[in-house]
């Protein structure tokens, strides 16, 4: 067995060590030899086995070497990367980040490669180890054989060698069977399709025939003639039915052809009938019968149908004599074969389709035998040498000279006609002649030519070699063409058509053939580097229309006289010279080829080659020839009619496509093989035989040398100067070059092209054989073509099959192939604006060039020989073959395939076998692959480390099958076989299985406290600590966890007063407590103070020391909380809590406990003796302490008088000092840092100097600046002074005190006092303008008027009074007129106006309204300014203050400042509120308030404002009210007016809005618009409210669950009682009744406890809501922070408007009134006390009004929400609950 490497880390092992290692492995793998094992028998290992072992060992060594080399390469690359990294870091520090990222990517790729290599190595080692183990076992088995028969051994060896071949043959046979089976299955599928297709055949016609049998009847004869519409409908229907037959694939191609024949015949019959009907109508309209002679005499032209209707039978001569024009259909009907000239003579117009229709080719002999007329022979073209050889004098062709050449030769050119465009002709008002119109060269479509009466010349059809090969046409090789006259002159017997001579015949006759130029295909030209000259492209009208090209209108030709008369200067045209002029000027003309007419050819004795004869489809049908269906080419019009989007080129359809589309193809010409022609009796024309040069040389035939075409480069290399050819430019090219062309293409000479900077494309040079021989060029031998006679003379038997030439042979023979079409992808066609069909669009090179498309050069594939010949060194690429490819190529692959990385495979273009690829999440994300989420299994530790909370579904309880059966579980057979059964905690709870803490701990179940409590699991402290569960004190209490302070600290519980008292189990038993087995085993038992109080356990002071209790709990438990306990537990006590607990604190203790020492926390100290002397009863604890502290209130209640010395150490509020009779001195206020308001200082009798007021932080406003008197003056005035006042130098009195004492304030004293207008008025002080100016009081005009101040404009300006013109006029101030219309006026106030301004204004409330006063005005009015208000320089007034001042508040001001006005405030202020303003300002208006404010509300506005209208109010509205559904939750809730609101009513909390509030608060904190402490308070309020809502829903659910569980047990007992009563066993009933009584008591106790919890939670919620409402309102006023506040909730049932008419009658509940008790009726009238006041939130889905299920619920306003159902009395049955609801509904209706 192979030895695996122990380490995969040390990759740096040397190759020698690896070689030694693998040599040792090889020795270990060798079988035990005979020397080592002398007991083994003599046995010879087969050579094949030895070779396999040898190859395995060699491959192993080879792979080991490769691995070592690869590792060394990786090490070197890593070293280079490290070096480059440090170089990069030292050279450019800025690129450090990118380099590190690249290093990370490379490192990741390197690690992935290592992982791939290791997996592959492991697989290889496993495979090799299996093979080697198999070989070793085989060797041992063979070595154990005792005796071997060598003959049998060799026999079986041969058989084993044959086994692979046998297996291969079996595999091939299996493959063939699979193919046969597939063919059979496909055949069955086809048969099935045929059966199915037959069932769906003619479905529409069958249905119509069943429903309306009359429509399935055939037309009558008269209907066919006169009803054209019906006839066309029937014909289209029959054609569609036939097309369905073709599309079913039930018929063969020949049968489909027959069906098409029937369809075509039906269509032709319909057309014929239509024509007959038209002619009948014409004959009836004429009503005149003429004889043929009359028609001839009157020269009346009749159609054949008209003649047939009149009974006249005409032939062609008669029709011509009578002037009757025959249509092509009529000519075909008479079986007349007309040539284009005959068509023109008869006036018949051929369409383009008719001209291009392919026809059957017959030889002249066949046509003569069939009696068919022959087309006259075509003219024959000769070259100059042929005409010289034949002695023919050619007619000299005219030579075209340019204007420069004419001018250079001094020739006076004849005036040429001038060409004008149609627009120019129209602008010059020329009347064109018929010849000028014809010479405009306008391209017309066939329809336009037919409409204009123009007969087009039929164009010949050109086929490419590929098309001829596809059509089976044998092209005639390049021969010499003679006219019949020339053939006759040469005395050769030829047919009536043109004659083709082979090169040998031409040489024998003395005719030298013209050398043919060689034509290259575009691919060959591209391969040779030749750029072809772009040729102009001609488009058909359909192509132009499809491409959206606007054709240029052709120009008009004018004669020189017309041009001169119009004053037009013609452009100089090239001059044409006659041969005589050229000879006179010494110009040598270029020889032109000579064209001979058939007569000239016949005169010269030349016999033309017979041409094939074209048969019409009727002739081929008459001869019984079946044409092969050819692909059909559709014109754009036909394609558009069939619903096909045509491409610019005609669309080529296969026969299958034409069958599928129901198109009848035009009969195509038929090509017959010699056998078919012989079978039909047709003698084919013998074809010439083509010989290769070798065959010709073998037969002794000397071929005529062919001319050679040289490229310009070759010609330049041989020193031949080619004749420069003229360049032809298209109009577009001339326009691009700035040349003004005539409408025709311009021909430039080489000199002109060179002058314009145009580089002409070099043209190939054609050399004659003589020139080739003179230049010493060896021409390529061309194949020789022999005529049948020459072949017969030489003894060569031609093959009767048609001869097919390859493109190379055609090129060698001088045949010019058509350039290959270009295929465009849909993207390219879309970019060019071409609408493609789903298939790629094929364009010819000319079309592609016209559209500006450059064809993509295709890659050239070179063979190794060509690569070597061209001197190209190919890059050696590693080739990877799959085992199948290697086996197909016969290559024996190495047992391990070579692994390529994806990049290498992509670079080599290899498509990898689709193996599953494993990607890391980063790779998947980089590739944009979304991985399928796989379930991940985590251990509890991993989940804890990842921060995942394991829910009970992920951690289950395991039971053995025996345990499950013992518990009464029914197991499935699969569960019974497994070792363990896993249950979730919920499943265990549902099955009644109790999960012990040990199971919960052992199984690692992470449960939330609520889940543990619901499952009945007692969560131990160790579990909570191990699972890192953070418990709140409430959760710990609910779960029954008793924690020590240390355990609580470990669990992260902040020790709040819900920590418990510890007892040992013995102490607990002594107290009478019943312990569980688990509690009996623990060392200590922990009880909460509440549990201890419920059990009647008295907590000792020592036990209380270790407990953190709230003051309320300590007070309720009777525990005296000491200062040390409060300090040790870090309890922050409020003064009220310290007072309630009886804690007496010194200032130091208060400071240590974090209590702010305000007067309620600093008390009066007494020693125990003093306290006993005062008659105080002391507790033992108080008797032990040194001092007893009493609050001032306690001292006052006990009747203890506080001396001034004791009062000095007490921080009292002014009210407390006043109530205790303590005179608070200024020093006490200063020492205690008490900020006193002026009112408090006055109440306490403290007189302050301005300096003292400044030290105490009192802002000296007019109420604090008082009148000073000396003690003597005060005694003289009759004032009684206290001893403290007698000692001071001055006594200060406020103006009010002075007024109360009857002291008159002199004006001098009043000058130093800052008084408000009200104070001055009450004191009897007349406020002068100087005082107002000295005090810097800014008065409004109204205040000045109320104070009775008469102000001049200057005084008003000094006082800062700014008023508008209207205000001045209202107050009575006459303003000084100024030019500025908007300038502020100066006002004068009277004493009455000043007196009316007696109002004090709180500043914070005025901020919401936006009524601003300047600081001077505020100081004058007695308003206290804060520092921030003084900075803003504006003061805000509340609506009440504005009303008292007579200031009118506009609705805009109220809207701009978001003032929330009550209806009373709005009415008092005179603000008229619209319903929109009321809704925008969140003002809730009752109907009475709306009526008092004069607001007319529509029902929609009332619904939006939360006003519930009565039916009478709703009917009083002008517009009928219809309730509309509301989308939002807040609008769906009906808001109750404040008058209907009760203090105990709740609020609706919008959860989403509160979450948005949190976001808003965070944003405000980021912008520093809100202080941190306010942010914390607001967040805590929101979080607490949301938590309370969640908890109370949980309370409700648990309460209901507990109730249902108790009811289930009670129902079970009730059933047992009924069952026992039937049996008569009374003693059992008594025990059951006892159990029922206990259950009822227990139910009351449980329900009472839950109700108490709900009440406590509801109190917390109401307190939180009130705090939130007040705090949010303060934030909105103070910081302009708009937060969503809780809304008042709806009453117990939804209030909806009463309906005047009900859609359905009210269904009474099925309750007998006689069975109801009077007590129940009286109780039913009262409102149902809700178990739960369910306030809806966003989390509970609101029930929007919809169609009610019953009239009762409709009367109640729809079904209530789920918590409403739980409000029903839980003690009553469901019928009783419904009865109470019904009584409530009656109350609502009343």
UniProtKB/Swiss-Prot annotation:
InterPro entries to which the protein is assigned, alphabetical: FAM186A_B_C, FAM186A_B_N, FAM186A_PQQAQ
Superkingdom, natural source: Eukaryota
Homology family: Belongs to the FAM186 family.
Name of the protein: Protein FAM186A
Organism per entry: Mus musculus (Mouse)
């Amino acid at each position: 067995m192979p030895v695996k490497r122990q380490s995969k880390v040390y990759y740096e092992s040397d190759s020698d060590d690896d070689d030694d290692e693998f040599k040792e492995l090889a020795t270990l793998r060798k079988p035990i030899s005979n020397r080592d094992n002398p007991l083994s028998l003599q046995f010879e290992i087969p050579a094949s086995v030895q070779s396999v072992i040898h190859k395995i060992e060699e491959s192993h060594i080879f792979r080991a070497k490769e691995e070592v080399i690869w590792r060394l390469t990786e090490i070197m690359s890593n070293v280079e990367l490290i070096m480059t990294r440090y170089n990069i870091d030292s050279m450019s520090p800025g690129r450090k980040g990118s380099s590190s990222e690249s290093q990370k990517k490379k490192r990741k790729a390197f690690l992935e490669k290592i992982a791939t290599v290791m997996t592959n190595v492991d697989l290889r080692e496993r495979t090799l180890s299996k093979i080697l183990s198999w070989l070793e076992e085989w060797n041992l088995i063979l070595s154990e054989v005792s005796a071997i028969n060598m003959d049998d051994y060799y026999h079986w060896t041969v058989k084993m060698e044959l086994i692979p071949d046998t297996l291969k043959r079996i595999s091939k046979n299996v493959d063939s069977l699979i193919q046969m089976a597939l063919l059979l299955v496909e055949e069955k599928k086809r048969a099935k399709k045929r059966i199915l297709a037959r069932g769906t055949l003619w479905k529409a016609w069958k249905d119509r025939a069943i429903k309306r049998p009359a429509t399935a009847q055939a037309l009558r004869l008269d209907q066919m003639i006169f009803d054209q519409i019906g006839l066309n409908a029937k014909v289209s229907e029959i054609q569609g039915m036939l097309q369905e037959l073709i599309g079913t694939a039930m018929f063969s191609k020949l049968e489909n052809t027959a069906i098409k024949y029937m369809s075509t015949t039906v269509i032709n019959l319909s057309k014929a009938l239509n024509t007959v009907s038209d002619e009948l109508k014409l004959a009836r309209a004429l009503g005149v019968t003429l004889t043929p002679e009359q028609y001839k005499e009157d020269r009346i032209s009749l159609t054949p149908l008209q003649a047939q209707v009149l009974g006249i039978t005409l032939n062609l001569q008669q029709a011509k004599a009578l002037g009757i024009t025959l249509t092509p259909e009529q000519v075909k009907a008479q079986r007349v074969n007309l040539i284009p000239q005959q068509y023109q003579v008869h006036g018949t117009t051929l369409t383009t389709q008719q001209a291009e229709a392919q026809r059957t080719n017959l030889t002249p002999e066949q046509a003569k035998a069939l009696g068919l007329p022959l087309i006259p022979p075509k003219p024959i073209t000769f070259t100059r040498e042929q005409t010289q050889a034949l002695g023919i004098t050619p007619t000299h062709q005219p030579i075209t000279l340019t204007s420069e050449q004419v001018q250079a030769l001094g020739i006076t050119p004849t005036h040429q006609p001038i060409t004008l465009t149609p627009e120019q002709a129209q602008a010059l008002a020329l009347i064109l002649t018929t010849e000028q119109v014809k010479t405009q060269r306008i391209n017309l479509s066939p329809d336009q030519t037919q409409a204009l009466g123009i007969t087009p010349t039929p164009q010949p059809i050109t086929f490419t070699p590929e098309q001829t090969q596809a059509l089976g046409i044998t092209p005639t090789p390049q021969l010499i063409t003679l006219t019949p006259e020339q053939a006759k002159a040469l005395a050769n017997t030829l047919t009536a058509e043109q004659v083709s001579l082979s090169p040998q015949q031409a040489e024998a006759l003395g005719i030298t053939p013209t050398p043919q130029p060689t034509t290259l295909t575009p691919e060959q030209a591209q391969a040779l580097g030749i750029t072809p000259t772009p040729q102009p492209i001609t488009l058909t009208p359909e192509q132009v229309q499809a491409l959206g090209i606007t054709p240029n209108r052709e120009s008009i030709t004018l004669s020189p006289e017309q041009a001169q008369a119009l004053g037009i200067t013609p452009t100089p045209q090239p001059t044409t010279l006659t041969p005589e002029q050229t000879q006179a000027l010494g110009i040598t003309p270029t020889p032109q080829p000579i064209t001979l007419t058939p007569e000239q050819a016949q005169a010269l004795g030349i016999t033309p080659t017979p041409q094939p004869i074209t048969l019409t489809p009727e002739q081929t049908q008459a001869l019984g020839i079946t044409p092969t269906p050819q692909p059909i080419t559709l014109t754009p019009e036909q394609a558009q009619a069939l619903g096909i989007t045509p491409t610019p080129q005609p669309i080529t359809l296969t026969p299958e496509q034409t069958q599928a589309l129901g198109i009848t193809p035009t009969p195509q010409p038929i090509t017959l093989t010699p056998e078919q022609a012989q079978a039909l009796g047709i003698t084919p024309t013998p074809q010439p035989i083509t010989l290769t040069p070798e065959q010709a040389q073998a037969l002794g035939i000397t071929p005529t040398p062919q001319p050679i075409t040289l490229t310009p480069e070759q010609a330049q290399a041989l020193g031949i100067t080619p004749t420069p050819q003229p360049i032809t430019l298209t109009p577009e090219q001339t326009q691009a070059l700035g040349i003004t062309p005539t409408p025709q293409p311009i021909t430039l000479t080489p000199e002109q092209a060179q002058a314009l900077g145009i580089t002409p494309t070099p043209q190939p040079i054609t050399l004659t054989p003589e020139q080739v021989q003179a230049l010493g060029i060896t021409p390529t031998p061309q194949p020789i073509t022999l005529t049948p006679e020459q072949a017969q003379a030489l003894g060569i038997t031609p093959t009767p099959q048609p001869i097919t030439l390859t493109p190379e042979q055609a090129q060698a023979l001088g045949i010019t192939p058509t350039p290959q079409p270009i295929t465009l992808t849909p993207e390219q066609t879309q970019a060019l604006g071409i609408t493609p069909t789903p298939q790629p669009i094929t364009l010819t090179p000319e079309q592609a060039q016209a559209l500006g498309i450059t064809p993509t050069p295709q890659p050239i594939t070179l063979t190794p020989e060509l690569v070597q010949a061209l001197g190209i060194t190919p890059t050696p690429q590693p080739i990877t073959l799959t085992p199948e490819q290697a086996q197909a190529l016969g290559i024996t692959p190495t047992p391990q395939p070579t692994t390529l990385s994806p990049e290498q495979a992509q670079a080599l273009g290899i498509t990898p076998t689709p193996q599953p690829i494993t990607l890391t999440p980063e790779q998947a994300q980089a590739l944009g692959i979304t991985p399928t989420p796989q379930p991940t299994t985590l251990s509890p530790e991993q989940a804890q480390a990842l921060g995942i909370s394991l829910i009970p579904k992920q951690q289950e309880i395991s039971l053995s099958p025996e345990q499950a059966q013992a518990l009464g579980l029914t197991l499935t057979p699969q569960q019974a076989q497994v070792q363990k059964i896993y249950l979730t905690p919920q499943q265990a709870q549902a099955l009644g299985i109790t999960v012990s803490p040990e199971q919960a701990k052992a199984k690692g179940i992470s449960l939330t406290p609520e889940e543990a409590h619901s499952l009945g699991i007692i969560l131990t402290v160790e579990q909570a600590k191990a699972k890192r569960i953070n418990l709140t004190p409430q959760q710990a209490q609910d779960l029954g966890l008793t924690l020590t302070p240390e355990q609580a600290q470990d669990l992260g519980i902040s020790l709040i007063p819900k920590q418990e008292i510890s007892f040992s189990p013995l102490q607990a038993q002594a107290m009478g407590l019943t312990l569980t087995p688990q509690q009996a085993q623990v060392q200590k038992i922990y009880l909460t103070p509440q549990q201890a109080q419920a059990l009647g356990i008295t907590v000792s002071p020592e036990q209380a020391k270790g407990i953190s209790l709230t003051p309320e709990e300590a007070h309720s438990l009777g525990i005296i909380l000491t200062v040390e306990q409060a300090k040790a537990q870090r309890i922050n006590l409020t003064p009220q809590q310290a007072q309630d607990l009886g804690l007496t604190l010194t200032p130091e203790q208060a400071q240590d406990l974090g209590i702010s020492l305000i007067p309620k926390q600093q008390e009066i100290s007494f020693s125990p003796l003093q306290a006993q002397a005062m008659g105080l009863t002391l507790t033992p604890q108080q008797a032990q302490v040194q001092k007893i502290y009493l609050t001032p209130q306690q001292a006052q209640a006990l009747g203890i008088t506080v001396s001034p010395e004791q009062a000095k150490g007490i921080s009292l509020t002014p009210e407390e000092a006043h109530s205790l009779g303590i005179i608070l001195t200024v020093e006490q206020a200063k020492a205690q840092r008490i900020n006193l308001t002026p009112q408090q200082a006055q109440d306490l009798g403290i007189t302050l100097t301005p300096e003292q007021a400044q030290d105490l932080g009192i802002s000296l406003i007019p109420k604090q600046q008082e009148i000073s008197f000396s003690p003597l003056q005060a005694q003289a005035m009759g004032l009684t002074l206290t001893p403290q006042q007698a000692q001071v130098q001055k006594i200060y009195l406020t103006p009010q005190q002075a007024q109360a004492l009857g002291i008159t304030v002199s004006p001098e004293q009043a000058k130093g006092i800052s008084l408000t207008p009200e104070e001055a008025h009450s004191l009897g002080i007349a406020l002068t303008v100087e005082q107002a100016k000295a005090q810097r009081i800014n008065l409004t005009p109204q205040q000045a008027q109320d104070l009775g101040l008469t102000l001049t404009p200057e005084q008003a300006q000094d006082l800062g009074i700014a008023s508008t013109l209207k205000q001045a006029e209202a107050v009575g101030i006459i303003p000084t007129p100024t030019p500025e219309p908007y300038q502020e006026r100066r006002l004068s106030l009277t004493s009455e106006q000043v007196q009316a301004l007696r109002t004090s204004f709180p500043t914070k409330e005025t901020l919401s309204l936006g009524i601003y006063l300047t600081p001077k005005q505020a100081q004058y009015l007695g308003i206290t300014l804060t520092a921030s208000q003084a900075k803003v320089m504006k003061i805000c007034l509340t609506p009440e203050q504005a009303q008292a001042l007579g200031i009118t508040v506009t609705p805009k001001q109220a809207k701009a400042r978001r003032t929330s006005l009550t209806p009373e405030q709005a009415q008092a202020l005179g603000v008229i509120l619209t319903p929109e303003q009321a809704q925008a300002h969140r003002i809730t208006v009752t109907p009475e308030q709306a009526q008092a404010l004069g607001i007319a509300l529509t029902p929609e506005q009332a619904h939006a404002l939360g006003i519930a209208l009565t039916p009478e109010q709703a009917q009083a509205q002008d517009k009928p009210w219809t309730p509309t559904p509301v989308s939002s939750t807040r609008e769906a809730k009906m808001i109750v007016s404040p008058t209907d609101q009760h203090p105990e009513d709740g609020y609706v909390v919008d959860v989403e809005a509160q979450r948005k509030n949190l976001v808003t608060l965070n944003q405000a904190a980021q912008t520093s618009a809100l202080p941190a402490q306010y942010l914390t308070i607001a967040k805590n309020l929101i979080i607490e409210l949301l938590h309370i809502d969640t908890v109370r829903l949980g309370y409700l659910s648990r309460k209901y669950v507990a109730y249902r569980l108790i009811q289930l047990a009670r129902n079970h007992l009730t059933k047992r009682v009924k069952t026992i009563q039937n049996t008569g066993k009374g003693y059992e009933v008594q025990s059951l009744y006892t159990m029922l009584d206990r259950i009822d008591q227990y139910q009351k106790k449980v329900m009472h406890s839950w109700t108490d919890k709900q009440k406590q939670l509801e109190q917390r919620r109401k307190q939180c809501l009130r705090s939130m409402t007040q705090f949010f309102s303060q934030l909105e006023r103070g910081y302009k922070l708009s937060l969503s506040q809780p809304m008042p909730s709806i009453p117990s049932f939804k209030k909806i408007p009463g309906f005047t008419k009900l859609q359905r009658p009210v269904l009474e509940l099925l309750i007998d009134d006689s069975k109801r008790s009077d007590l129940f009726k009286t109780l039913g009238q009262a409102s149902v006390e809700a178990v739960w006041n369910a306030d809806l939130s966003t989390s509970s889905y609101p029930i929007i009004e919809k169609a009610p299920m019953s009239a009762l619920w409709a009367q109640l306003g729809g079904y209530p929400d789920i918590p409403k159902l739980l409000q029903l009395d839980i003690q009553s049955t469901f019928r009783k609950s419904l009865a109470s609801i019904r009584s409530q509904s009656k109350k609502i209706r009343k």
